[in-house]
């Protein structure tokens, strides 16, 4: 079974220092796994989703690629608008990502009883995840997981 490591910035790391935070983590774990995932989409780390913006995502993906020899995937949120999704996919592709992981959990709890903070997965997310997968497949030739 291939072992992958999902990387995310520390909760105390400022957004402007995120690329270096990912690089440090990459250097520590890259030799232990078969692939890495740039996770910029978890709703549970304050500010993490802002890293899906092209200005951050390009540097983060490039830093992870530069500090490892294993394939690097980028994991995106299902809550991105189509334009944001397109920008993120384009940047990930240009930065050398091996594929896109679509999607992480959603922060959209519309129509669901109050379940508290954090991401939601499962059946309520399935329709949107399928929409994102279809959209990403039209945007890139990269594999989609």
Predicted regions and their residues:
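Active-site glycine- and acidic-residue-rich loops that bind
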Residues: 9-22, 49-50, 73-93
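Glycine/Thr-rich beta-alpha phosphate-binding loop at enzyme active sites
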Residues: 40-53, 85, 89-142
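A structural motif
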Residues: 33-35, 69, 97, 141
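Active-site beta-loop-alpha junctions enriched in small/polar residues
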Residues: 6-12, 41-43, 75-79, 103-107
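P-loop/Walker A phosphate-binding loop and immediately adjacent motor/lid segment at beta-alpha junctions
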Residues: 1, 51-76, 115-130
């Amino acid at each position: 079974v291939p072992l992958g490591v999902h990387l995310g910035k520390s909760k105390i790391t400022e957004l402007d220092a995120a690329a270096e935070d990912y690089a440090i983590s990459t250097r520590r774990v890259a030799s232990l796994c078969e692939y890495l995932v740039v996770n910029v989409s978890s709703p549970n780390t304050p500010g993490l989703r802002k890293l899906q913006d092209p200005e951050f995502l390009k540097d983060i993906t490039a830093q992870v690629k530069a500090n490892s020899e294993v394939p690097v995937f980028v994991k995106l949120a299902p809550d991105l608008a189509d334009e944001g999704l397109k920008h993120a996919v384009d940047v990930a592709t240009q930065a050398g990502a091996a594929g896109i992981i679509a999607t992480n959990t959603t922060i959209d709890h519309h129509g669901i009883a109050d379940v508290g903070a954090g991401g939601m997965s499962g059946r309520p997310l399935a329709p949107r995840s399928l929409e994102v997968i279809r959209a990403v497949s039209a945007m890139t030739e990269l594999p989609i997981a």
